[in-house]
Each structure stands twice: as structure tokens, then as C-alpha cells.
Amino acid sequence: MPNVPLIQAALGQAVTDGVFPGAVLAVRHGGAAIDVFTAGRLSADEAARAVLPATVYDLASLTKPLSTVTAVALLIQAGRCQLHDRVESILPELAGSPIGTASIWHFLTHSSGLPGWRGYYERVSPNAAIPATEEDRRRAREAVLRMIRDEALIYERGARSLYSDLGFLLLGMIVERCSGVPLQEFFRDQIASLAGTSQLGFVPTEWADNFLQCARRRGSDVAPTEHDTWRGRLLCGEVHDENAASLGGVAGHAGLFGTAEAVLTVTGAWLEAYHRRPSVLDALLVKEFTCRQTVVPGSSWALGWDTPSPPSSAGRFLSEASFGHLGYTGTSVWIDPLHELEIVLLSNRVHPTRKNERIKAFRPLIHELVYREYVGDS
């Protein structure tokens, strides 16, 4: 049996040490009941409410595997696209551009040649005028698509990997073109609904106020992120990532909000398929998506999922078959299929400022502790 007080104490000590104002840690081992640990408060304000298991966090780049990668896998299963389809065959606006001949596989492995990040939001929404309707979001997506079309590649495609939000911006658009519906609707109907959760989803700009009110009526709260200088306010219930915000809160690289237990509904679908048990995902495809793509020199990436490579946020003990992802706001998920161990850490380490990077040292320590307590010494 895991030493629950020891794990709880470690999470509480992280709050004391200023790693984050509060956090939720959810662990599932061997398909057993989920253990949820909480510590701290919603914000740095001493009067703030305590974090609860139902606290909702901005998941940041966990959007990539939970939404975009899962959506791509489902679309491949349905025959709507293939891993090696060229992006220009799906987004003809990119025909003739430097990135046009890259494939879905290149974006999933972060080996497309695109830069890692660009501040497109400064051009799309120069006055922080966030799109508030589907038509506004469509125009913003078209503007971002043109900007990516005009990007010069900064390394030879496939020669190495460079973690890129730009590639996942395109993957989000690919999901919409191949499915024929907005990304938030595809996620709601084809992923969250089938996984059996209503506590995980995108928050388009016009839904933000209602989202906060609904969360509170359910007895949960939304953890704030940063005092954002671009938008001139404390962010709570609206996406922290500026490029995602400039697209109206819905994008392939960021935008999901949810609870730790809700995250486990999606990771559980991946784990079940990995072991050829009933799942919405195809077992062979899941094995391919979670296997490190060694054809890219020096890369730790599988298809949209990362794999452990020292020094890793996963710590030293998770098996080589493990896969996971990090989120900039202070979130992470790691899945060890050989030990059937799923670990979700949600926090708002960027509150009140993104300059706090203490979580980098904490992540491997908490993953090692959880492994020892649930699996045993390694």
C-alpha cells in the first residue's frame, strides 16, 4: 500500500517551498481507484479558497496529447487522414510554401523544420482584442495560417527535433478540416464524451464568464494563472497562452481546461488500448503513437507524446515504455504502461508570475516518490 501521508507531505512541502500556490496530484495504479492528493490554495492570496480534487486548471500544452494527438489518432482510424499525408493536401493554403510538403508525422515528432514559437498574437490581436465569435476565430486562424505559410524553416526537416507550438497550431487546423467541425466540438463529442467526462474541454472566449459560474455551481473553482500584461488582468477561466487566446481560446497547442480526474479519463483510453483492452482508440495505432521515433536523430519524441530521457521530468524510475507530456502553466501527465501507472499533476505555478520555475526540480522528485510508493523500489 502506498504511504499516502508521505505523498501528501511532499505536495504540501512544495507549496511551502513556493513551487506553486496549490496543486492536485491524481494517481491510478493497475486500474484501481484513483487516489487524489491536494495541497495549497487557488492563489497566492492568504484568503483564497483551498484547492479541491474538483479544482479546474488551465492544462496548457497537455492540450497537445489529450486533444490534438488523440483527435489525429481517431481521424486516422476513421480513414480521414494518414500519418504521412502532406499538410498542403489538407490545408491547400500552404501549397508552395516552405512547410507545405511536411507531413502530419513531422508535426507530431516536432521535426518539421518550423521554429518553436512565434508571437503571432501581437499581430493577430495587437490591442488584445480577443475573438469572441466563431467568425472572429475563423479570421484569426486564417491570419495565423498565413503567418506560418510565410515562415522560413530553421533546420532541415527530419534532421532533428525542436519542440514547436507552430506545428501543433497546424495540427489543430488539420483536425478541423478533416473532421469538418470546430476543434472544441470534435473534442467534446468524440473524445470527452466518449471518455465519459464533462470536466474537460476548451473555453472559447465568450464562454469564460459562464464557465466560471458553472464551475462554482458544481462546487469547484478555476485556479487563476498569471497577471497578464498583454491583456492587463489576472487570468482566470481564460487561456494563459497568448497565441491560443488570440485564436479565441481554442487551438491545437493550448486551450484545454479540466480536473485531474478528468485528465485520467483520456489517459485511461490510451492505456486500455495499449494493453488491447476495449477502448475508443485502436491498439496498434496507440503502440505506434507511444513508441519513440528513433528515425529522428537524438529525439525523445514519440508521435505527439514524449518519452523519458535523462534528465527527465518523469524521474529515474518509470520504464522506457512510458509516455507523457508537460504543460507550461505547471501541469504534467506521465503514463507507465508496463506498470499500469498513471500520474497527473495539475498546478498553477505561473501564478502570479511565469518567472517561477521551481517546478522543474519538483517534477522528477514527485514522480520518483509516486513510483516507489505504488510500484516499489527500482
Mark where each language-model region is:
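Short, conserved catalytic-motif segment at the N-terminal edge
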Residues: 2-59, 80, 146, 241, ...
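Short, surface-exposed loop or secondary-structure junction motifs
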Residues: 97-320
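Short, gly/Ser/Thr-rich active-site loops of penicillin-recognizing serine hydrolases
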Residues: 272-275, 281-293, 310, 352-378
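Short active-site loop at a secondary-structure junction
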Residues: 13-26, 46-106, 155-166, 251-254
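Short, well-ordered beta-strand elements
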Residues: 35-37, 333-334, 340-349
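Glycine-rich phosphate/pyrophosphate-binding beta-alpha loops
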Residues: 249-255, 322-334, 348-353
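Hydrophobic (often cysteine-bearing) scaffold residues that line and stabilize catalytic clefts
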Residues: 3, 7, 59, 63, ...
